[in-house]
């Protein structure tokens, strides 16, 4: 009987502690991210299938300016741009000449990259966060998210080392960073204008 009571007490303690642990991890991650206000780096991307087989390699450049400004230029194997200007998340595919625009608040569920620059608690509230040393594991609360998991590797000084995603179908994307610097970045690099002749899918009008 005493053993049963002890087991129940231990389980209750873990149950009560879990929410606090998640909250502490989210707070620690946000604290680390806030330590660096400007960041840019080249990246290499490895895409693997659910069974671990590498299916594609890519490269590009990522630029961050806090708060809320984000830009990712994919250069290989195919050019594309993801730009967050603080309100709108733009995705541009020059190969098919198509632009998609979403409100950041609507897109963060499927595009967790914007959390790297976001101070908006409503964005962070969409994810559960766990910490394992310098790796933070983010899992979306919404069941309809296309993302299963987003990992951020960042040290105690706020230096972003890399990140990765696991999609709902099991495909993983690993981003490794190099040529990291903290030189100032002009705000106009985070502005986007729809190129002439491009097809424009404005999801903002459909959701607001």
UniProtKB/Swiss-Prot annotation:
Highest taxon in the source lineage: Bacteria
Compartments where located: Periplasm
Coiled-coil regions, chain positions: none
Disulfide feature: none
CC annotations in GO: outer membrane-bounded periplasmic space
GO biological process, one term: lipoprotein transport
Keyword Signal: yes
Transmembrane annotation, as ranges: none
Keyword S-adenosyl-L-methionine among UniProt keywords: no
Keyword annotations of the record: Chaperone, Periplasm, Protein transport, Signal, Transport
A Pfam match: LolA
Subunit-structure text: Monomer.
Function: Participates in the translocation of lipoproteins from the inner membrane to the outer membrane. Only forms a complex with a lipoprotein if the residue after the N-terminal Cys is not an aspartate (The Asp acts as a targeting signal to indicate that the lipoprotein should stay in the inner membrane).
Family affiliation: Belongs to the LolA family.
Name under which the protein is recorded: Outer-membrane lipoprotein carrier protein
Gene name as annotated: lolA
């Amino acid at each position: 009987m005493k053993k049963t009571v002890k087991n129940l007490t231990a389980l209750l303690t873990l149950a009560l502690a879990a929410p606090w642990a998640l909250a502490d991890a989210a707070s620690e991650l946000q604290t680390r991210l806030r330590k660096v206000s400007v960041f840019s780096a080249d990246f290499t991307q490895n895409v693997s299938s659910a069974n671990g087989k590498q299916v594609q390699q890519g490269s590009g450049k990522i630029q961050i300016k806090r708060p809320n400004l984000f830009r990712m230029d994919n250069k290989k194997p195919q050019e594309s741009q993801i730009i967050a200007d603080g309100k709108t998340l733009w995705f541009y595919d020059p190969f098919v000449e198509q632009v998609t625009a979403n409100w950041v608040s609507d897109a963060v569920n499927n595009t967790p990259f914007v959390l790297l620059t976001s101070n908006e608690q409503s964005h962070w509230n969409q994810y559960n966060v766990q910490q394992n040393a310098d790796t933070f594991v983010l899992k979306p609360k919404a069941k309809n998210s296309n993302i299963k998991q987003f990992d951020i590797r960042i040290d105690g000084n706020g230096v972003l080392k890399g990140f990765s995603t696991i999609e709902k179908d099991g495909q993983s994307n690993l981003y490794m960073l190099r040529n990291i610097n903290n030189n100032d970045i002009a705000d106009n690099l985070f502005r986007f204008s729809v190129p002439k002749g491009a097809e424009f899918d404005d999801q903002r009008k459909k959701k607001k």
